[in-house]
From Swiss-Prot:
BP terms from Gene Ontology: apoptotic signaling pathway; cellular response to type II interferon; chromatin organization; intracellular signal transduction; negative regulation of translation; positive regulation of apoptotic process; positive regulation of canonical Wnt signaling pathway; positive regulation of cell migration
Residues carrying Phosphothreonine: 180, 225, 265
InterPro entries with a match to the protein in the record: DAPK3_STKc, Kinase-like_dom_sf, Prot_kinase_dom, Protein_kinase_ATP_BS, Ser/Thr_kinase_AS
Modified residues (Phosphoserine): 304, 306-307, 313, 321
Enzyme class: transferase
Posttranslational modification: Ubiquitinated. Ubiquitination mediated by the UBE2D3 E3 ligase does not lead to proteasomal degradation, but influences promyelocytic leukemia protein nuclear bodies (PML-NBs) formation in the nucleus.
The organism's place on the tree of life at top rank: Eukaryota
Protein name per UniProt: Death-associated protein kinase 3
């Protein structure tokens, strides 16, 4: 963000007469206190709210100041200082007091092509410097081509008003609708990408007017003018160009080309034979024709200043440009929506592909699970069979155990019976033995 001096400009400069005004700017002559140096103070009305159409936005002011601070060329106005207050940004600029070039030429009794090219060469030099820095002026027109001092032997051209100038960045697309309808290029009218080539078209229009005093595309209405520009509807009327050289016409033809890429560049224009050749055979031209051309230029200059208030056409065109800016913003929003839609579609496709891959993996997993399940079922069947067999064997074993138990009980009963019988027999034997013993004893006693 550019920083401007937050001081009262009138503490440093004494303000004088008004030199000119536009839709949102007033230019006043001023004198620096202490040095007595004279400058031009351009008061630019700031836009208070982003949504407002009144005033100039901060971004636009900073862009103009940034460009003016960067450029230093004999044929371009110089920025001296910048102040800011609550309502305005004030540019302290070089004082260009010689008036407009066309007014100066209109005052001349006659005008030769050589004189015209001398001034045009200065315009081309200034534009060449701008284009070397990738800066497009975008508002080249007679009232922005001034003389530093019209009383000098060789008056110096000064290009002024960089309010809509832009840096043309490589790789970035820039579109806008601005400028003065009579001088704008077809790509501006048709809202197409803009570049340095737009300035070259304006130079072609300026040259046409300079040599004829007529405007090539000017219609009865602004819409007719814009239609003529878009269709490149112009010709070299014999009434205006009877004394104009073919080289001059060729120079104009190479500039008034609809396709910007086929239009002559600033470097090519400086190398054009009409600009390079300084001396011409003026004897072949009739002096009265040259006087007539100067008179027509005078008529054009008077008409351009008196037919309507200054910058009215620009104001209307700017309002139209605001509408197109809104349309452009809507188109940009639509493009963003379409881009978002494409991104959503791409995401849906990616999600669908991921889902299909997951489904395929699930199918593969399901097939594996099916195989495992079948294997488990087989194993389970085998286990069930083994369990059934084991149960049957257990039942058989239990049944066998019950039989054995019953046999054991019977054996135990038989054992008990035999034991009782044996015990009785043993007792009998014991009794028998005892009886026999007694008998033996009695027998022995009897013997004695």
């Amino acid at each position: 963000m550019s920083t401007f001096r937050q001081e009262d400009v009138e503490d440093h400069y004494e303000m004088g007469e008004e030199l000119g005004s536009g839709q949102f700017a007033i230019v006043r002559k001023c004198q620096q206190k202490g040095t007595g140096m004279e400058y031009a103070a351009k008061f630019i009305k700031k836009r208070r709210l982003p949504s407002s159409r009144r005033g100039v936005s901060r971004e636009e002011i900073e862009r103009e100041v940034s460009i003016l601070r960067e450029i230093r060329h004999p044929n371009i106005i110089t920025l001296h200082d910048v102040f800011e207050n609550k309502t305005d940004v004030v540019l302290i600029l070089e004082l260009v007091s010689g008036g407009e070039l066309f007014d100066f030429l209109a005052e001349k009794e006659s005008l030769t092509e050589d004189e015209a090219t001398q001034f045009l060469k200065q315009i081309l030099d200034g534009v060449h410097y701008l284009h070397s820095k990738r800066i497009a002026h975008f508002d080249l027109k007679p009232e922005n081509i001034m003389l530093l001092d019209k009383h000098a032997a060789s008056p110096r051209i000064k290009l002024i008003d960089f309010g809509i100038a832009h840096r043309i960045e490589a790789g970035s697309e820039f579109k806008n609708i601005f400028g003065t309808p009579e001088f704008v290029a077809p790509e501006i009218v048709n809202y197409e990408p803009l570049g340095l080539e737009a300035d070259m078209w304006s130079i072609g229009v300026i040259t046409y007017i300079l040599l004829s005093g007529a405007s090539p595309f000017l219609g009865e209405t602004k819409q007719e003018t814009l239609t003529n520009i878009s269709a490149v509807n112009y010709d070299f009327d014999e009434e205006y160009f009877s004394s104009t050289s073919e080289l001059a016409k060729d120079f104009i033809r190479r500039l008034l080309v609809k396709d910007p890429k086929r239009r002559m560049t600033i470097a090519q224009s400086l190398e054009h034979s009409w600009i390079k050749v300084r001396r011409r055979e003026d004897g072949a031209r009739k002096p009265e024709r040259r006087r007539l051309r100067a008179a027509r230029l005078r008529e054009y200059s008077l008409k351009s200043h008196s037919s309507m208030p200054r910058n009215t056409s620009y104001a209307s065109f700017e309002r139209f440009s605001r509408v197109l800016e809104d349309v452009a913003a809507a188109e940009q929003g639509l493009r963003e929506l379409q881009r978002g839609r494409r991104q959503c579609r791409e995401r849906v496709c990616a999600l669908r592909a991921a889902a299909e891959q997951r489904e395929a993996r699930c199918r593969d997993g399901s097939a594996g699970l099916g195989r495992d399940l079948r294997r488990l079922r087989t194993e389970l069947g085998r286990t069930e069979a083994l369990r059934t067999r084991a149960q049957e064997e257990a039942r058989a074993a239990l049944l066998g155990a019950g039989g054995l138990k019953r046999r054991l009980c019977r054996l135990e009963n038989r054992y008990d019976a035999l034991a009782a019988q044996v015990a009785a027999e043993v007792q009998f034997v014991r009794d028998l033995v005892r009886a026999l013993e007694q008998e033996r004893l009695q027998a022995e006693c009897g013997v004695r």
